[in-house]
Every structure is written in C-alpha cells, then in structure tokens.
Amino acid sequence: MTKKVTKIVAQKRAGRYNIYLDEQYAFPISESVMIKFRVFKGMEVDEQLQAAMIAADDVSKAYTRALDYLSHQLRTEKEVHDKLRDEEIDESVIDATMQQLRDMRLLNDQQYADAFVRTAKRTSDKGPRVIRQNLRQKGVGEQLIDDALAGQFSAEEQIDNASELARKLAKRYHRQAFKTMQQKVRQGMMTKGFDNDTITAAIASLALEPDEDEQWEALVAQGTKLWQRNRKYAFRERMMRTKRSLFQKGFMMDDINRFIDEQVADE
C-alpha cells in the first residue's frame, strides 16, 4: 500500500524530523536519512520504502551514539560494539553502524594499539606482557598487538623502563636481605610484564651490591623479633628456629651466627 508524505515537521532536537503520511504521523528520521532517501512533501512511500527509511534511521541514531562515545577518546571496535550492545541496540543495526564507522575511518584497532603502547611505555611501568593483556581485554587481535609492540616498544626501551622499575623496587625492599630483595625485584618486574631476558639485563645494569651496614641492621631488626617470638622454646630449639627463619629470609649464615652469638652473650 502506497501513501504520500503530507507533512515534514522539525523536532525540537536539532537534525530530527517527524514524517506524516496521509496526514497521519508515521515515523521520525534524521536529517541524514531524509537527504539519503530524498524525502520531500508529496513523495510516495510504500511499506518497503518506509521500512528501509526506519532501518536507516536506526543506524543513524546508533551512529550518533557511537560518535559521542568516540568523541572522548580512542576506542577499539570491541569497546564500541559493546557500548552499543549495552544500549540494547539490535545486532544488525550495530553491524551496519560498525561498517559505517570503518568506512569513515573512525575505527582502527591498529592505530589504537600503537597509541596504547606508546602511552603505556611513556607513562607507566608496564612491560609487554601486561600491555598485551590490556589490549586483549579491549578486543585487539594478536597480530595487531604484535605489530604495535614491535613498532612502538623496542628492546632497548624495554630495558630502560625495566631498569627504572628495578631501581624503584630495589629502593622499596632495601631493608630486606639482599637475596630476598633481588628475588622481590625480579618477581615485581615479572608481575609488571617484563620477560626474563629483559629483567636480567635491567638488574645487571644497576650493578646492585649489598650494603653491609644496611644488611646487618635488617638482620638485627628481623632477628630480634624472631628471637623474642621463639623464647617459649628450649634454648637449642629457639636458636635453631631463629637461624632457620633468618636463613630462609635470605641472610648470610656468617651474619646469622654472629647475631645469635650476640643474643646468647646478652642473656
């Protein structure tokens, strides 16, 4: 059944219009859809054309929402898709909207990944593995991630960033036994996403050496707590438990024996 456009009324919202067919309100459309279908007063509209205009308007509205979402920062295809889905937009409309965004070059996961890696290496202490995990969560494909990391985060830059992180971690744990400090530095760097080769190179670049005075102070501080905690045991058991705990914490046995000797002398 064919009807005729008898009235086109602008809505209060800019760029939106109400279409009347045979003097009856029929449907709303955007200005872009009206231009696309060349809608004019007196135009004949059958059911198929009306359905096509309504479908195009659904895409137009979804496209506008996507543009608003993209206006704040770069987004991946998955982020935009999920945003539209969360707004309960039909999947077919989302697919058409996503293609329109691609055609307009408003979605590009490679550019997103490149920018993400550049920002992460400059403003954070994240290594490649954590950056990869972040990009995966945002829906970026493995090959795109590989290309971004290879092009934006060189091996030299990774060692530089890892060295700075190692320096911070060494400072944080400097009151621990030197061996324990080294283990925690390495563990912390692994948690941040650096690989073993990079970690080894970074630690080597710092040329970390134990400070004898600091190590002794740390041993005394921890040893005193252990010595007091173990006072309920017989002397030999107390001594062995304290020694074992200090050794497990990474202190040198010669220093441990010296500490124990001093405790025995004081009692």
Swiss-Prot record:
InterPro entries from the xrefs?
Answer: RecX_HTH_1st, RecX_HTH_2nd, RecX_HTH_3rd, Regulatory_RecX, WH-like_DNA-bd_sf
Key words of the record:
Cytoplasm
Domain of life, per lineage: Bacteria
A Pfam entry, by short name: RecX_HTH3
> Where does it localize?
Cytoplasm
Q: Name one GO biological process term.
A: regulation of DNA repair
Gene3D superfamilies assigned: Winged helix-like DNA-binding domain superfamily/Winged helix DNA-binding domain
An annotated GO cellular component of this protein is: cytoplasm
**NCBIfam families to which the protein is assigned, alphabetical:** PRK14135.1
User: Mind telling me which HAMAP family this protein's record contains?
Assistant: RecX
**Protein's job:** Modulates RecA activity.
Homology family: Belongs to the RecX family.
For this entry, the protein name equals Regulatory protein RecX
**The encoding gene:** recX
